[in-house]
Structures are given as structure tokens and as C-alpha cells.
Regions:
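Short, acidic/turn-prone active-site loops that include or flank metal/cofactor-
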Residues: 15-16, 61-64, 166-169
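Short loop/turn motifs at secondary-structure junctions
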Residues: 33, 52, 114, 139, ...
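Structural motif
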Residues: 35-38
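Mid-sequence, gly/pro-rich, charge-dense loop/helix-turn segments that line enzyme active sites
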Residues: 47-137
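A C-terminal functional module that forms or caps the active site or interfaces directly
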Residues: 121-163, 168-172
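Regulatory input/activation interfaces that engage signals or partners
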Residues: 161, 166-204
């Protein structure tokens, strides 16, 4: 976590849903109230035609496809019988809608952001069969490793959560031509500059 500057606190969570949930929960507990959370990171694309390498995506809904009863036919989230969180009319099992209006948190929306569903996974899709199975079931645009945990932490504190991600790879492939991490990191730095008016952020 970096100090507050101009009303902005930067929380570097590390990789994966466990890291993300712990880091954001710790920050929210220590630093008081926030008007919103912007989750920035990388993602793998299930639809390279809509979201090619280097594209910016705006997450409309987070799905955790690894929560529930696991059998030969896949995951049955409702079958487990337990919601992860309930409040008012909202019952979160494995899906959580996100805010998509960046004005809710006082920021401009990138004109080129492609909207779509994202899956949060602890293990990225490294083969075509897994990627195809997830794509058929959930119709996602992308997959990531932190989004659902961040969104759930925000929901529990009633804080708007917006998620923007740059496509770094094509889900289901580890071929060199389907990965572009240097490009994605450069685009992520430029995105930060455009959102916050700061010099490009170098991400190593």
C-alpha cells in the first residue's frame, strides 16, 4: 500500500484472489472510508476478435467459476447451498455485477474500453479445452485472477467497484504469439496516466 496522494491510495495486492481479498480488506480496515475502488490489472481474452492483445476491457460482471460442488460435469455453485454474502435483495453465490460508470468514482471512462463479463480464476486457462468449456458455460470476455475477490470486498463495504483490465494473453494458449505482456504492461501504464493525469506508470 502506498500513501494517500490527491485523494488516491494505491494498493498493490499481488497475484491471485487470496492476495487480493486480504490486501484490500486490510487497506479498507486501516484507511477509513472510500468513495470507490478502481481495480486495474491484466486479463486473458476469450474473444480475441472483440478484445485483442493490448485492448482495454471494462468488466460488467465478475464470476468465480471455481466456487461450488465440483463433479465430473463441472461446478454446481447453487448446489453447495451457501451464498458467499447476502445483503438486502443481493445474494452473492458465484456472480457479482460491477459498476460500469466511472463517473461514480469521479473518473472518465476510456473511450476504447470493451465491456464484458470476466471470470476470476486461481489457475489460468492454459489449454484450449478448459478455455472452451468456460467460454461455453459463462460467455465471458476475459479471465483474471483477482477481480471477484476485490468486488466482493467492496460489496461488503457498500463501495462502488469499477474494474478495467488490459488484455495480456489469449485464454487457453501459452503460445508466444498469444501473449504480449510487455505491451499490456505499457498499455496499463498509459491507462493510469489517462485516468489520473500522472506521468506514465512503469510497471515491472
Amino acid at each position: 500500500m502506498l500513501p494517500v496522494r490527491h485523494g488516491l491510495t494505491v494498493c498493490i495486492t499481488g497475484v491471485g484472489p487470496v492476495n487480493a481479498g486480504i490486501a484490500l480488506g486490510h487497506m479498507l480496515a486501516l484507511c477509513g472510508e472510500y468513495t470507490g475502488v478502481l481495480n486495474l490489472g491484466l486479463a486473458g481474452s476469450f474473444d480475441p476478435a472483440r478484445a485483442p492483445l493490448g485492448a482495454c476491457t471494462l468488466v460488467t460482471e465478475e464470476i468465480w467459476p471455481e466456487y461450488g460442488l465440483l463433479g465430473d460435469d463441472g461446478i454446481d455453485a447453487p448446489g453447495l447451498g451457501f451464498a458467499q454474502w447476502e445483503h438486502g435483495g443481493l445474494r452473492v453465490v458465484d456472480r457479482l455485477p460491477l459498476h460500469t460508470d466511472l463517473a461514480d468514482i469521479g473518473l472518465p471512462r476510456p473511450a476504447d474500453a470493451v465491456p464484458g463479463i470476466s471470470l476470476t480464476v486461481a489457475g489460468v486457462s492454459a489449454d484450449a479445452r478448459r478455455a472452451d468449456r468456460l467460454a461455453r458455460r459463462y460467455r465471458p470476455l476475459s479471465e483474471n485472477m483477482e477481480g471477484f475477490a476485490v468486488a466482493l470486498a467492496c460489496a461488503r463495504r457498500h463501495i462502488p467497484c469499477v474494474e478495467l483490465r488490459i488484455i495480456s494473453n489469449n485464454a487457453g494458449s501459452r503460445a508466444p504469439e498469444d501473449r504480449a505482456f510487455p505491451l499490456a504492461l505499457a498499455q496499463l501504464g498509459t491507462l493510469g496516466q489517462n485516468l489520473f493525469g500522472t506521468p506514465p506508470i512503469r510497471l515491472l
